[in-house]
Every structure is written in structure tokens, then in C-alpha cells.
């Protein structure tokens, strides 16, 4: 069975949709859409009708490219008021004594049972390690022999309204949300490596109007916070200083400015029309000074937030989000954070831009989740193959659906 997934990132500035296939453990882009959004502020839906218009446009673009109908998606949810709690569970293994993917699902279900509050929604549960009889620190228990299977896991939850509002938007379009995840976890899935998986790391996503700072310990999320500042504030600064409208300011930021004035050129000049209809000349140095000033503030606030989230030494920091694409960004972040920081670098053909880190990471995350449970699944069955012994067939009342929230309905 081909493993084809559709992921959606509902951002304040744009909606990103990715259809990709996992083949030989690599993500291959089949289609991608990026359209301007409206109806979302600070990462939260404020006008359902407006977001529906943008979402329809993005979906139609994907469907037109692939000549298919999108009816299932994975969606990112905002990190506002997310909580992370360590939970444990244990189940007995059947008479054969061989642990299966179903046993993994059962023990995770046991771990979260009765621990979810009424106003909270389970976003995901991430195994820290499994226990087979008396043996701890097992990463993959499948096919091992034992009488009992235990797990220590991190349960991530968010206010129910954060998830319900997103699901209802898709349902109104006849689309099922089969899985959700925090954008910060998706970002980590995109950029994780041996260094990040062995120590304390941070992911900083500079979005349009918010910046999300998340901490991970050996690949497991432990804390997250949202700062009310982002790329939009840079646009506002450019607009104020040069008396330009916001749209022109954004274009100049993305296509002309650099993140560090050290790498700007005084003789590189762009002409622009002000809100007073005056024609002015702007040097790359002048606009980059404005950009660098606000970027420095954002990065310093993010750095301060990492100290508030943990007192442990952070060994690895990843900067992502569309704003991270500005030329010279690596030099600026190293000045502020030191040598243990890197700007994200997506090398997948078709999505080589940090604004796609969340949609790409969502797909990598669900594929890892399914493999750990010994399941196969596709959202778009191009081969029309209904066979497959381990293909998921799950209804709303199933154990798996209860464990992972709105997971599968096929």
C-alpha cells in the first residue's frame, strides 16, 4: 500500500496544504498549496466564514493539481494553554506472549484512561519508553516476548475549543480530520536529528503574528509557550518608518531586506510609493536596519522564554517559520543564541522553505506513529487497493480513536 497523506497548517497569514507520499522512509511531495488566509488571528479562528473561503481555495488548488478529492486531512492545532503530563499504563499480553501493535495501542489507551479533564482535548501521546516485564527503557516492544507491557509516556492536551473549532471548519466542507498535532511537535519532527534526540532542545517558530517556543527532552516535548509577536510586527515597523501600506512593506521585507544589516548593500535601492502618493527611494541598508531591530527583539524574547521554560542547559536550538528565510538570518541568531543554534533547512524538493516545516512534520509524525503501532494507512488510495492485512479500519467508538482524539474514520 502506498502511504499518502494530506496535512494542513492554518496560519494567520496563509494556509499551507501538503499532499505527500512516504516511500523508503523519505517524504516525496505530490502537491502543495499556499494561499493567503483570513479569519485567523494569533493562530486562533476568529471568523469561520472568512477562513472557509481561504480553505476552499487552497483545497481546490490541490484537487486541481492531482485530479482527486480531498476528504481526509491531518491538521495542526495551536499551542495556546497546552499542557504536558507524564502518564503510565500497563496491560497483560495474551497467551502467545508476543507483543503486537495492538498491544501498543492498548497500553497507550490505558495510560491516558481517566486522566483527561472534561474541558481538555487529547492532542497526542508520545511514548518515552516501554517496559516488558521488568525490562525498562525499551523503545520498540513489538515482537518481544513477555507477560506484561508497560509504558511511560507524555500526554499532550489543549483546550477542547482549540481542536473543536478546527474540526468543525473541515466538517463543514465534508472533510474528516483524522489526526491532529501541535505545530511545534510537527516542526520538531521535521528537523530532529541525533543531536536533538539526545539532549534538551528548543524549537522556535516565528510566525506571522505569534512566535512559539517549545522545549524537548530527548525528542519528547516538555513545555511550550506562545509570544505575542511575529513577522507582522516587522511589516508594521517598515510601514511606519517609510510610510508604506502593509502589503508593500511585507513584499519589501521578503524580497529586498536582509536579517542582518552587516550583509546589506547601501547602493542597492528600491523605489516605493508611500501612502501619501510620494515616490521614495529605500536602500537595502536602511530597511534591513528596521528589520534587524525587530528581529533582534523577537529572538531575545524567545531566548528569555527558553530560560523561563527550563533551567537546564539547551544543547540544540532550531529556528523555523517563514521569517527564518530572510537572508543573513543564521548570522543574527548566532549572535543572540551562540553556536548551538541553526536555522531550519528543509531539503525536500517542492517545499524548500521553512514556512512548510509544520505540514511536512505533520506527515512524518503520523507515519512514525502508525509504524510504531504496526499499521498501514493511506488518505488517498491512488492504487484503489483495499487489501492489506494491517490496514486501519476504525470507527468513532474504537479504542484507537479514543486514545488519539479524532484519529481515523474510514
Question: What do these predicted regions represent?
Answer:
Residues 1-14, 18-201, 245-246, 251, ...:
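Nucleotide/phosphate-binding catalytic cleft detector across ATP-hydrolyzing
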Residues 9, 193, 205, 304, ...:
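Extended, folded domain segments that form the structural surfaces/walls around functional sites
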Residues 13, 259-260, 313-333:
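Glycine-rich phosphate-binding loops at beta-strand->alpha-helix junctions
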Residues 68-79, 309-323:
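Short glycine-rich phosphate-binding loop at a beta-alpha junction
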Residues 148-150, 217-221, 309-316:
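Short, surface-exposed connector motifs at secondary-structure boundaries
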Residues 193-261, 265:
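Acidic, glycine-rich loop-and-beta core segments that form the ion-binding/anion-interacting portion
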Residues 342-388:
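Glycine-rich phosphate-binding/hydrolytic loop that grips phosphoryl groups
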Amino acid at each position: 500500500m502506498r502511504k499518502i497523506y494530506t496535512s494542513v497548517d492554518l496560519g494567520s497569514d496563509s494556509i499551507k496544504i501538503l499532499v505527500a507520499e512516504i516511500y523508503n522512509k523519505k517524504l516525496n511531495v505530490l502537491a502543495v498549496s499556499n494561499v493567503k488566509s483570513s479569519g485567523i488571528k494569533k493562530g486562533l479562528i476568529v471568523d469561520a466564514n472568512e477562513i472557509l473561503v481561504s480553505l476552499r481555495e487552497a483545497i481546490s488548488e490541490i484537487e486541481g493539481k492531482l485530479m482527486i478529492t480531498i476528504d481526509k486531512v491531518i491538521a495542526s492545532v495551536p499551542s495556546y494553554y497546552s499542557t504536558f503530563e507524564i502518564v503510565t499504563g500497563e496491560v497483560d499480553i495474551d497467551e502467545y506472549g508476543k507483543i503486537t501493535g495492538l498491544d501498543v495501542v492498548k497500553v497507550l489507551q490505558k495510560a491516558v484512561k481517566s486522566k483527561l479533564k472534561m474541558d481538555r482535548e487529547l492532542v497526542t501521546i508520545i511514548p518515552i519508553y516501554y517496559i516488558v516485564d521488568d525490562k525498562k527503557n525499551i523503545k520498540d516492544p513489538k515482537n518481544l516476548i513477555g507477560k506484561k507491557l508497560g509504558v511511560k509516556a507524555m500526554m499532550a492536551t489543549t483546550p477542547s475549543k482549540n481542536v473543536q473549532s478546527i474540526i468543525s471548519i473541515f466538517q463543514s466542507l465534508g472533510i474528516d480530520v483524522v489526526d491532529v498535532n501541535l505545530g511545534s511537535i510537527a516542526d520538531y519532527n521535521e528537523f530532529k536529528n541525533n543531536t536533538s534526540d539526545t539532549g534538551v532542545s528548543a524549537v522556535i517558530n516565528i510566525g506571522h503574528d505569534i512566535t512559539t517556543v517549545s522545549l524537548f527532552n530527548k525528542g519528547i516535548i516538555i513545555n511550550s509557550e506562545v509570544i505575542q509577536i511575529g513577522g507582522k510586527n516587522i511589516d508594521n515597523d517598515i510601514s511606519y518608518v517609510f510610510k508604506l501600506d502593509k502589503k508593500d512593506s511585507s513584499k519589501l521585507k521578503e524580497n529586498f531586506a536582509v536579517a542582518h544589516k552587516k550583509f546589506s548593500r547601501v547602493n542597492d535601492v528600491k523605489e516605493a510609493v508611500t501612502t501619501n502618493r510620494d515616490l521614495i527611494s529605500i536602500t537595502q541598508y536602511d530597511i534591513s536596519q528596521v528589520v534587524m531591530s525587530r528581529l533582534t527583539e523577537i529572538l531575545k524574547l524567545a531566548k528569555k522564554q527558553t530560560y523561563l521554560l527550563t533551567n537546564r542547559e539547551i544543547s540544540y536550538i532550531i529556528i523555523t517559520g517563514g521569517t527564518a528565510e530572510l537572508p543573513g538570518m543564521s548570522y543574527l541568531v548566532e549572535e543572540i543564541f551562540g553556536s548551538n543554534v541553526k536555522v531550519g533547512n528543509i531539503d525536500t524538493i517542492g517545499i524548500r522553505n521553512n514556512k512548510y516545516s509544520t505540514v511536512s512534520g505533520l506527515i512524518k509524525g503520523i507515519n512514525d506513529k502508525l509504524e510504531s503501532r504496526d499499521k498501514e494507512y493511506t488518505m488517498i488510495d491512488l492504487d484503489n487497493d483495499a487489501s492489506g492485512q494491517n490496514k486501519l479500519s476504525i470507527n468513532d467508538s474504537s479504542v484507537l480513536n479514543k486514545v488519539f482524539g479524532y484519529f481515523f474514520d474510514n
